[in-house]
Regions:
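Short active-site neighborhood of thiol/selenol oxidoreductases, capturing the structured segment around
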Residues: 4-16
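Short coil/turn segments at secondary-structure boundaries
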Residues: 23-26, 55-57, 70, 81-83
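Non-catalytic, surface beta->alpha helical segment in thiol-disulfide oxidoreductase systems
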Residues: 63-111
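Flexible, charged surface loops at secondary-structure boundaries
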Residues: 2-5, 35
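Short cysteine clusters
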Residues: 18-21
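Thiol-based oxidoreductase modules, predominantly thioredoxin-like and allied folds used
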Residues: 13-14, 25-32, 36-53
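Structured loop/turn residues at beta-strand edges in well-structured enzyme cores
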Residues: 37, 60-63
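Compositionally biased low-complexity segments enriched in polar/charged residues
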Residues: 4, 42, 49-52, 58, ...
C-alpha cells in the first residue's frame, strides 16, 4: 500500500451550467484517461457540494468555476488545505500547462 507521499491529489470544481467548464471538459476527460496511477482525481460538481464550495471560496482557495487544485504528497505543511498548484478559468493553454506540471511532478514522486 502506497502512502500519500508519492501521490498528487487533483481536485476539480465545476458545474454543468458553466460555459468555461464545458470548454475544458474534453481536455480534462482526455487528461484523466492518461494520468499516472499516483495522481488521484476528484471531480466536484459545486451544485452537489455547495457547502464545500462556499467554504473554500471564503478561504480564497477557489475563485470560481472551473478551478483545479493540486496537492503534492511530498510537501509537508501545517496548513494541509493550501494547494501546491492551481488553475482557474477556461483558458485551455493555462489548463494544459497546469496538467503538464502535474504530470511532471507525478513522475518525480515515483522515481
Amino acid at each position: 500500500q502506497r502512502s500519500f507521499r508519492d501521490r498528487i491529489i487533483v481536485v476539480k470544481f465545476s458545474a454543468e451550467w458553466c460555459g468555461p467548464c464545458k470548454k475544458i471538459k474534453p481536455l480534462w476527460n482526455e487528461w484523466i484517461s492518461i494520468v499516472s496511477s499516483n495522481i488521484v482525481i476528484v471531480d466536484i460538481d459545486i451544485d452537489e457540494s455547495i457547502d464545500l464550495y462556499v467554504q473554500l471560496k471564503a478561504k480564497k482557495m477557489v475563485k470560481g468555476v472551473p478551478t483545479i487544485l493540486a496537492f503534492y504528497g511530498d510537501i509537508m505543511r501545517d496548513q494541509w488545505y493550501i494547494p501546491d498548484d492551481s488553475v482557474s478559468g477556461g483558458n485551455e493553454g493555462d489548463v494544459k500547462n497546469f496538467m503538464n506540471r502535474c504530470l511532471i511532478k507525478a513522475k518525480t514522486l515515483i522515481q
